[in-house]
């Protein structure tokens, strides 16, 4: 045990849209960690809340004719209920727009002002003359001055990830009306982040959590630290002290929410919030997505230091999520919604929790695939863990009517102890994937133990020996149920009850895994886990594919209307592929020779990733024959092969057609 109270927080979900599985990469591991630490004897408080301020919420509320508060409350309830369904249970889930956070934020900002870490400065800020308003943050879009990518006003989210100050973005466009923005001067307030460079260089190397968080932050600090503008020209948000026309920047009041939510919890629990946020030895651990490392490892500890608060002891940053091998994108349809696509389809929260924690290392990119999901559920959860628990309890109930009154063999206890020690070390290192693997290794040991000892055969010759085997296996079952509970709480509570215990498994420590199960009657067991059927996986894949197709159709640029005469200018003919070979230095291009009946031509086509050369030879394809010749990768191309979609599906005739036939 650590000997000090632990406080675990999660990055705040933004109340601007529904929960998807990308969100869960932060919240499920945090809940897993909290449950495990509590079952290991640690005192842990788990707080979070919704992030309610900032320009995106104001814009969304304006677009739907609502108010930011109404929009925030709606999605706050949505996230609260979704987390409950996913068995992510916080001690406090607050709102950054609640009175406590307004009060705490203003208090901390006032202290920063008193300590000399905030100053006023007149800056150029984007202004839309058509809308007659200043354009903070996401009200404006333009070009990142650092890398040239398309960026929003406060962050280069599509490119280098750098924080952008007001006035830095180039070629600014108003997101409200689409008009060109101009720059006008306005007074704002800045936090002296640059004053904390030496502090951060000393603090970050000792910061616990994942190495990605430390290393990324150190890289940024070693380069250059700019002071942060901490005010915005908005009506919605926490008012900056002494200025009714300015609010505090959302990345100030959002992390301060961690403190506010701790205060709210402490008021109800009769505890002292200062035990967690004041003093040199705090036990604060932040679970965040990898895209907000800068805010949590640089800006946040500097702000806390400047205001005289304690500092986080660990930051655990996750990798990003991809969908079926594609970059996560709501606009392109590559998204899996937690409720609509998963929970509302009757799929267990336990299965998704397992997938998110066992798929890969927490800091690496996680790809969500429905096919892989089905395979892992069926092979690992059902086939390994569920199979061992069920066959053990079924045999115990059938042959002995309950748990034999026998102590487990020493070798079984030692194997359980080895497994639990491995799990404990990995959990405290935030190595969740390998911790889950170590748990599943114990289940595999159990399967091997019962299979090798074959009590169904042994009972015919030596009933006492068979009874000992089952007592050993039931001890392994107990250990598995206790250690898997933080990962799959619903299923393990049911398994605990089947073992004959009538209380809440959460009231028991993992250390009880080696205490004898004890003689007790067992009811006929039921299966803990159901397989995911192939037709269900196919239906879920179809839903995702349809969403992607709809998104692609909606995003497709609308082409201008052309006359029949203009279309007639295109000479589109059927051509037969005579040969196909890769172009040196390119992974995408083929050099094709095609037969047009009256002549043969050389054409370059970008279909190498989708077809082997021998698949193309002899195939009839559609060719634009009067396209101006061009050199592509140094190879002359006289025409264009027509193909459809991202997978480059070739357009071919349904019946045999002579090469050179014109398409009309």
From Swiss-Prot:
According to its UniProt record, which reaction does this protein catalyse?
Answer: tRNA(Met) + L-methionine + ATP = L-methionyl-tRNA(Met) + AMP + diphosphate
Source organism per UniProt: Methanoculleus marisnigri (strain ATCC 35101 / DSM 1498 / JR1)
Quick one: a GO biological-process term for this protein?
A: methionyl-tRNA aminoacylation
The molecular function GO annotations come to: ATP binding; metal ion binding; methionine-tRNA ligase activity; tRNA binding
* Positions that bind ATP: 330
> Which Enzyme Commission numbers does its entry carry?
6.1.1.10
Outline the extent of the tRNA-binding domain: 566-664
> What name does this protein carry?
Methionine--tRNA ligase
